[in-house]
Amino acid sequence: MAATCEISNVFSNYFNAMYSSEDPTLAPAPPTTFGTEDLVLTLNNQQMTLEGPGPQTRSQRDRTDPLAVLHLAEKASWTSERPQFWSKTQVLEWISYQVEKNKYDASSIDFSRCDMDGATLCSCALEELRLVFGPLGDQLHAQLRDLTSNSSDELSWIIELLEKDGMSFQESLGDSGPFDQGSPFAQELLDDGRQASPYYCSTYGPGAPSPGSSDVSTARTATPQSSHASDSGGSDVDLDLTESKVFPRDGFPDYKKGEPKHGKRKRGRPRKLSKEYWDCLEGKKSKHAPRGTHLWEFIRDILIHPELNEGLMKWENRHEGVFKFLRSEAVAQLWGQKKKNSNMTYEKLSRAMRYYYKREILERVDGRRLVYKFGKNSSGWKEEEVGESRN
């Protein structure tokens, strides 16, 4: 009941703000005891006011003007935040805006299921949104996809090239179910046999460990301790398998707005690489393949392929294995795309990197921000090793 009251208050405030300028009779006051049915009735009354019957006055036409709806959106608090960080109130405001923008019949919306924050909303699949919002679910899903992946177009071409270099990750280990366990609609859609959420994080599959990672199989079986791994950061395996435990949805770090972009790629596809280059990649795989399966290998492969670097990272001292992140959030998003995790941030990625300190695969460079060093148990980054793998 408390959730329904909160939903009703948000929708009431929304329509009061939109309809109170000229004629207060156009916005009927909600009843004292406001339930889900009353909320649907109020929204339907608003649409009857907008759409008829009878000719519209000038003031009514102004209220359906797209410019008026846009002006209302500019005043909403959700426009200044990423969807993953929206509060429950901001989610309801955004839903209200979409209902008004699309002139949608609100009677088909199941408002009892709208009590969720932005992280939960972003974890919903298209089928889940259709269950709650009916045909409007397609529009909401498309809008969320645009808002949460505004930088994916810029980086997706790098993923394609990395995967052509033999760095595609293994098949999922088993079938743990199509939805994140935090989704409020997972069980219902599991019963219906629906498809998996596009925001669900894939798990690691079996594969031969690369050099320097002989005890990865031990880490895979150590998931019961993963909830206590926040101090040491946990492995990249822990990050994917138990992210909802290590990083709860209501604990996202503040996103740094206005982070400067370095070396942004011009529009269009990158230049075509020579046939000899692709023959080298496809015909003569490195002895360290499969590559890029683990986080430290992913970082290494970006560094040893300047044609893929695109201003993301640079060598500070190649001989000593010292490197620096130039666009830390962009690298984190690349890793998130590779692991099907749309909520990846540099803070989470750096925590996972700490896992390699104890194994002496990576080292911290004291006193220098965003600077790290490959340890004695790492491999494949030295110039002589790279030369051997390409011969």
From Swiss-Prot:
It comes from the Eukaryota. Residues 262-271 have a biased composition (Basic residues). It is found in: Cytoplasm; Nucleus. GO terms for cellular component: cytosol; Golgi apparatus; nucleoplasm; nucleus. Disruption phenotype: Mice show about 30% fetal lethality at around 11.5 dpc. Approximately 70% of the mutant progeny are born and display severe alterations in tissue architecture in the small intestine. Elf3-deficient enterocytes express markedly reduced levels of TGFBR2. Keywords: Activator, Cytoplasm, Developmental protein, Differentiation, DNA-binding, Inflammatory response, Nucleus, Repressor, Transcription, Transcription regulation. Residues 211-229 have a biased composition (Polar residues). This is ETS-related transcription factor Elf-3. The gene is Elf3.
